[in-house]
C-alpha cells in the first residue's frame, strides 16, 4: 500500500541526514499516516489512511 494520504495525496519527501561532520545521506520523510473509519453516504464505513495534519483540519471543521 502506498504511503500516501487518501484525501490530500501527501506522500513521502526526500531529504538528507546531516552528521556533525556535515556528511549528507539521502533519507525519506514519510507522512504521519493514521488509519480512520469514515462513513459513506450509503451508511457503510470504510477504513482509509489520512495524514495527521489532514485529520486536524477535518476536526476543525474547515
Swiss-Prot record:
GO terms for biological process: translation. InterPro entries: Bacterial_rp_bL28 (IPR050096), Ribosomal_bL28 (IPR026569), Ribosomal_bL28/bL31-like_sf (IPR034704), Ribosomal_bL28_bact-type (IPR001383), Ribosomal_bL28_sf (IPR037147). Signal peptide: none annotated. It holds the Pfam family Ribosomal_L28. Keywords: Ribonucleoprotein, Ribosomal protein. GO terms for cellular component: ribonucleoprotein complex; ribosome. It comes from the Bacteria. Transmembrane segments: none annotated. Belongs to the bacterial ribosomal protein bL28 family. This is Large ribosomal subunit protein bL28. It comes from Helicobacter pylori (strain G27).
Amino acid at each position: 500500500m502506498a504511503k500516501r494520504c487518501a484525501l490530500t495525496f501527501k506522500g513521502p519527501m526526500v531529504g538528507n541526514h546531516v552528521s556533525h561532520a556535515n556528511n549528507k545521506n539521502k533519507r525519506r520523510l514519510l507522512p504521519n499516516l493514521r488509519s480512520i473509519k469514515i462513513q459513506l453516504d450509503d451508511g457503510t464505513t470504510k477504513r482509509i489512511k489520512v495524514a495527521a495534519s489532514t485529520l486536524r483540519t477535518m476536526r476543525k471543521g474547515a
